[in-house]
């Protein structure tokens, strides 16, 4: 029992999830404009796109470094938290290639992983946290987990202590 305060934060993933519609080709001006308007709207967490080892162009919300993301962030003082996604198994950027957190670019990494990638995801999460970033753990396809597998995953996440752990699907 007892009354526990519930805290909610809004996360906008337009530039990452929306990319499945337009192949992440938002255009540089649109990317900077969307980020600026989301900042003005005081959105809690703004996802800028994917961190990927793929070849990318400046017109896409696909980035191969946090420095590339820094270039599109609002230039004024920012109150929103900026993050990017690394999707294990999807032309991902290995976290060893991340530069240490310096406060100029993104603050966090959303890490997605499948059931067969849990141990790898935990290993990667440790690397990301050691570099100073907040890590958000997002298992993919949890509908295919048994109850016991979900409980075991929760236990592993409790040991890891990520900034956030959430179930989407």
Regions found by a protein language model. Give the residues of each.
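N-terminal amphipathic alpha-helix/helix-capping segment at the start of soluble metabolic enzymes
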Residues: 1-17, 22-24
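Short amphipathic alpha-helices and their capping/turn segments at secondary-structure boundaries
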Residues: 3, 31-40, 154-158
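N-terminal glycine-rich anion-binding loops that anchor highly charged ligand groups
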Residues: 7-13, 35-52
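A structural signal for isolated positions on well-ordered beta-strands in alpha/beta enzyme cores
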Residues: 9, 83, 136, 164-166
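Conserved, mostly hydrophobic/aromatic
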Residues: 18, 38, 109, 165
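Glycine-rich anion/phosphate-binding loops
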Residues: 25-33, 113-120
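Active-site beta->alpha loop and helix N-cap motifs at the rims of alpha/beta catalytic domains
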Residues: 45, 50-156
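Conserved C-terminal portion of the radical SAM core fold
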Residues: 150-169
């Amino acid at each position: 029992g007892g009354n526990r305060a519930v805290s909610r934060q809004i996360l906008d993933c337009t530039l990452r999830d929306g990319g499945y519609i337009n192949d992440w080709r938002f255009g540089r001006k649109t990317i900077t404009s969307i980020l600026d308007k989301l900042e003005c709207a005081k959105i809690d967490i703004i996802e800028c796109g994917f961190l990927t080892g793929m070849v990318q162009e400046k017109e896409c919300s696909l980035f191969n470094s946090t420095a590339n993301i820094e270039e599109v962030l609002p230039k004024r003082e920012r109150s929103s938290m900026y993050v990017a996604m690394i999707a294990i198994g999807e032309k991902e950027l290995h976290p060893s290639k991340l530069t240490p957190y310096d406060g100029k670019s993104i603050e966090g990494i959303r890490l997605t992983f499948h059931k067969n990638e849990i141990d790898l995801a935990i290993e990667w999460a440790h690397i990301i946290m050691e570099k100073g970033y907040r890590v958000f753990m997002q298992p993919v396809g949890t509908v295919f987990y048994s109850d016991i597998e979900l409980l075991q995953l929760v236990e592993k996440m409790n040991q890891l202590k990520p900034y956030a752990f959430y179930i989407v699907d």
